[in-house]
Curated annotation (Swiss-Prot):
It is found in: Cell membrane. Homodimer. In MsbA the ATP-binding domain (NBD) and the transmembrane domain (TMD) are fused. Its main location: membrane. The keyword NAD does not apply. This is ATP-dependent lipid A-core flippase. GO terms for molecular function: ABC-type oligopeptide transporter activity; ATP binding; ATP hydrolysis activity; ATPase-coupled lipid transmembrane transporter activity. It comes from Wigglesworthia glossinidia brevipalpis. Involved in lipopolysaccharide (LPS) biosynthesis. Translocates lipid A-core from the inner to the outer leaflet of the inner membrane. Transmembrane domains (TMD) form a pore in the inner membrane and the ATP-binding domain (NBD) is responsible for energy generation. Its EC number is 7.5.2.6. The chain crosses the membrane at residues 15-35, 62-82, 152-172, 252-272, 274-294. The gene is msbA. The lineage of its organism: Bacteria, Pseudomonadati, Pseudomonadota, Gammaproteobacteria, Enterobacterales. One of its GO terms (cellular component) is plasma membrane. It holds the Pfam family ABC_membrane. Keywords: ATP-binding, Cell membrane, Lipid transport, Membrane, Nucleotide-binding, Translocase, Transmembrane, Transmembrane helix, Transport.
Length: 581
C-alpha cells in the first residue's frame, strides 16, 4: 500500500511512464495552449495604440493594420484552441486506455485472496471511475494550468512593461493567493478520497441488487436496499457540497484580494507623480489586464479540486498496482503429468482468519486413483483443492505433483494439468460451444465439442434449442437451469482431457436421472486420471479408490468404502444416516 505521505511529485513520477509515449501530442497541445493565451494577451495590448493614437486623424496607419491584427489574432486563437483540444483528448484517451489495460492485466494475475477481500463493485469502480478520473482530471488540469498560467504570465509581463510601478503591487498578492490555494487543496484531497471510496460502495450495492433481485423480492428487502443506496448516495452528495463550499470560499478570497489590489492601483495611479507618466492607453491596458486576471486566477483556484480528484484516483490505482501478483517463479514444464499427488505436513490459514483451515495434512494419491473428500461444510475439503491448484499457498509444508514441488512448476503449466468443476460454476455471456471450449476455441473442433457435450449428457437439451451449440446463454448462464449449467461445466472439463480431474460437488445441482447419466460419463473419463471428488452423497463416494474424511482441518479417517464401514467410525455413521433417508 502507498504511504499516507505519498507526495504529488512521486505520484506524477509513477504516472509519467504511462503518459510519456504520447509526449509528442502533449507538446503540441501545450504549444497550442500557449499560442492561445498569447493571442488573448496581444488582443488586450492593442488597446494602448488604439486609445493613444487610433482616433487621431494624422495616424491613418493604425486604422489599416489594427483590423488585420484582430482577424489574425482571432484566427490564431481559434485554430490553437482546436489543436489543443484535439491532442489533449487524444492523449487522455490513450492514457486512460493504457491504465485500464494495465490494471486489468494486473488484476488477472492477482492471488485469489485479493478478490476475497474486495467487493466486485469496488474493483469495478477502480477500473471504470478511477481511471476516468485520472484522465479527465489530468486533461482539464493541463488545459487550465498551461493556458491560464500562460495568460497570467503574459498579462503580468505586459503590465510591468507598461508601468512597473503600478504592477509591482501584484508581487505582494501572489504569495497570499498561493497560500490560500495550498490550504484548501489539503481539504480537497481528504474529501475526494471519501467520495471515491464511496463510489465503490455504490457499485457494490447496485451489483448486489442486480444479482440478488429475486431474493430481495421474495424476502421483501426492497426498502432496506433502497435505504442503503440512499444513505451512500446522500453521503457522496454531502461530500461534493463540501468541495463546492471550499472552492467557492477560495473564489471569494481571491476576488477580495484582487479587488483590494485594484483599489490600491487606482489610488496609486491618481498620485501626481504617477499620473504624469501614464497615458489613457496605458491606464486602460493595466486596469483591463487586472480585470482579465480574475478569470485565470479563478480557473486556477477551481482546477485544484479537479487536480485533487486525479491525485486521489492515482493513489488508489497505484495502491492496487503495488499489491504483489501470484508468485510464479517456477520453470518446470511438462506436457502431461502422470498425476501422482502428495501433501506433506500441510498447514494453511485463510488470510484474516485466526484458526487454521488445514492442520498438518499428509496425503499420498497414486496416479490414476480416485479420491473422495467428505466431511461437513467448512471442514477443509475445498481448501485441499485450492492448494493443489495454487489458488492459495500453504503456510507450512509442501505439495508435490509427480515428485516435483508445485512451486517449481510454471503456474500456467500446472493448471493445464487440472480440470475443475466447482460447485460455484461461472459461465460466460457467450455461446454454449465457446463456453465448453473456453480459452481453447482455436484448438478444438466442433466434433470434439459435441463429443464432450454428449459425454456430459448436455446435448439432450442443447439439440432442443433453436441455435444449438451457438445459443447465447446470458451472463453466468442465466438462460439455463442449474442442472444444465452444471452439465456445460462438466463438458468443459471433459474437453480439456487433463490428467487430474477435480469435481467439487459437480453433480449437486442435478436431478437423480441426470446425476446417474453424468456419473456414468465421469466414471469413463476417470480411467487413467487422478480424480479428486468432493461430495456428500454416498452414491458418488462409494466407487472411489480412497475416501478421506475431513473434519476441522484434519483427516480423521481414510480408506476405501468397505474398510471404513468395517471400522464402524464416523464414515459408517454417515453411511447409515443416508441409507435411512
Amino acid at each position: 500500500m502507498l504511504k499516507k505521505n505519498f507526495s504529488t511529485w512521486r505520484i506524477f513520477c509513477r504516472l509519467w511512464p504511462i503518459i510519456s509515449p504520447f509526449k509528442s501530442g502533449l507538446i503540441i497541445s501545450i504549444v497550442a495552449l500557449i499560442i492561445n493565451a498569447t493571442s488573448d494577451t496581444l488582443m488586450l495590448s492593442l488597446l494602448k495604440p488604439l486609445l493613444d493614437n487610433g482616433f487621431k486623424s494624422s495616424e491613418n496607419k493604425i486604422s489599416i493594420w489594427m483590423p488585420l491584427a484582430i482577424v489574425a489574432l482571432m484566427l490564431s486563437r481559434g485554430s490553437s484552441g482546436f489543436i489543443s483540444s484535439y491532442f489533449i483528448s487524444w492523449v487522455s484517451g490513450k492514457v486512460v486506455m493504457n491504465i485500464r489495460r494495465n490494471l486489468f492485466r494486473h488484476m488477472m494475475n492477482m492471488p485469489v485472496s485479493f478478490f476475497d477481500k474486495r467487493s466486485t463493485g469496488a474493483l469495478l469502480s477502480r477500473i471504470t471511475y478511477d481511471t476516468e478520473q485520472v484522465a479527465s482530471s489530468s486533461s482539464s488540469v493541463l488545459i487550465t494550468i498551461v493556458r491560464e498560467g500562460s495568460l497570467i504570465i503574459g498579462l503580468f509581463f505586459m503590465m510591468f512593461f507598461h508601468s512597473w510601478k503600478l504592477s509591482s503591487v501584484l508581487i505582494i498578492i501572489t504569495p497570499i493567493v498561493f497560500f490560500s490555494i495550498n490550504q484548501v487543496s489539503k481539504r480537497f484531497r481528504k474529501i475526494n478520497k471519501k467520495i471515491q471510496n464511496n463510489m465503490g460502495q455504490v457499485n457494490f450495492i447496485v451489483e448486489q441488487m442486480l444479482k440478488g433481485h429475486k431474493e430481495i423480492r421474495i424476502f421483501g428487502g426492497q426498502k432496506e436496499e433502497i435505504d442503503r443506496f440512499n444513505y451512500v448516495s446522500n453521503f457522496i452528495r454531502q461530500q461534493s457540497m463540501k468541495i463546492v463550499i471550499s472552492s467557492s470560499t477560495l473564489d471569494i478570497i481571491i476576488q477580495f484580494i484582487s479587488s483590494i489590489t485594484l483599489a490600491v492601483i487606482l489610488y496609486i495611479s491618481s498620485l501626481p507623480k504617477i499620473i504624469d507618466e501614464l497615458t489613457a492607453g496605458t491606464i486602460t491596458v493595466i486596469f483591463t489586464s487586472m480585470i482579465a486576471l480574475m478569470r485565470p486566477l479563478k480557473s486556477l483556484t477551481n482546477v485544484n479540486a479537479n487536480f485533487q480528484k486525479g491525485m486521489v484516483a492515482c493513489k488508489t490505482l497505484f495502491s492496487i498496482f503495488d499489491i504483489k501478483q501470484e508468485q510464479d517463479i517456477g520453470k518446470c514444464y511438462i506436457n502431461r503429468a502422470r498425476g501422482e499427488i502428495k501433501f506433506k505436513n500441510i498447514t494453511f490459514t485463510y488470510p484474516g482468519k485466526e484458526n487454521p483451515s488445514l492442520k498438518d495434512i499428509n496425503i499420498k494419491i497414486s496416479a490414476g486413483c480416485t479420491v473422495a473428500l467428505i466431511g461437513s461444510s467448512g471442514a477443509g475439503k475445498s481448501t485441499i483443492v485450492n492448494l493443489l491448484t495454487r489458488f492459495y499457498e500453504a503456510d507450512k509444508g509442501s505439495i508435490f505433483l509427480d515428485n516435483i514441488n508445485l512451486k517449481k512448476y510454471k503456474l500456467s503449466n500446472l493448471r493445464n494439468q487440472i480440470a475443475l468443476v466447482s460447485q460455484n460454476i461461472y459461465l460466460f455471456n457467450d455461446t454454449i460451444a465457446n463456453n465448453i471450449a473456453y480459452a481453447k476455441k482455436k484448438i478444438y473442433s466442433k466434433y470434439q465439442i459435441e463429443k464432450a457435450a454428449y459425454m456430459a449428457y448436455a446435448m439432450d437439451f442443447i439439440i432442443k434449442m433453436k441455435h444449438g451449440l451457438n445459443t447465447i446463454i446470458g451472463e453466468n448462464g442465466t438462460l439455463l437451469s442449474g442442472g444444465q449449467r452444471q452439465r456445460i461445466a462438466i463438458a468443459r472439463a471433459l474437453l480439456r482431457d487433463c490428467p487430474i480431474l477435480i469435481l467439487d460437488e459437480a453433480t449437486s445441482a442435478l436431478d437423480i436421472e441426470s446425476e446417474i447419466k453424468v456419473q456414468k460419463a465421469i466414471d469413463k473419463i476417470r480411467k487413467n486420471r487422478t480424480s479428486l471428488v468432493i461430495a456428500h452423497r454416498i452414491s458418488t463416494i462409494k466407487k472411489s479408490d480412497m475416501i478421506l474424511l475431513v473434519e476441522k482441518g484434519k483427516i480423521i479417517e481414510y480408506g476405501n468404502h468397505n474398510e471404513l464401514i468395517e471400522k464402524k467410525g464416523v464414515y459408517a455413521q454417515i453411511y447409515r444416516l443416508q441409507l435411512d433417508q
